[in-house]
Design a protein with these regions (language model features):
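Acidic, Ser/Pro/Thr-rich low-complexity regulatory regions
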Residues: 1-101
Length: 101
């Protein structure tokens, strides 16, 4: 489990950055749409508010005990895939897969 924790701490920031890059592209699409300025603003505001609550944007209480929950949130948000968990223990990956079914 210690190996998983060290790998998690090493990768979390990169995963979050990549997810935020994807969100920024989605925000650009909203801003570049043909909608009215008001509709763009409302849509963008709601999306940013919803995205902010995602563990992929802001992982709260990063600790060994919360690592599993954060990984599950990242997978559910499609910020990462099971392939991104290469190097993590088989036990951890199997436990995550069970909950994703």
């Amino acid at each position: 489990m210690e190996k998983d924790w060290k790998l998690f701490k090493k990768k979390l920031g990169g995963w979050q950055e990549a997810y935020m890059d994807r969100l920024i592209e989605e925000y650009k699409d909203i801003l570049n749409s043909d909608a009215s300025s008001f509709d763009k603003y409302c849509t963008l505001r709601k999306k940013i508010y919803d995205d902010y609550k995602s563990p992929s944007v802001l992982a709260r209480d990063v600790s060994r005990s919360n690592m599993f929950i954060i990984l599950l949130g990242l997978l559910r948000d499609e910020a990462i895939t099971m392939d991104d968990l290469d190097g993590f223990s088989d036990e951890l990956k199997e436990d995550l897969q069970q909950l994703l079914k």
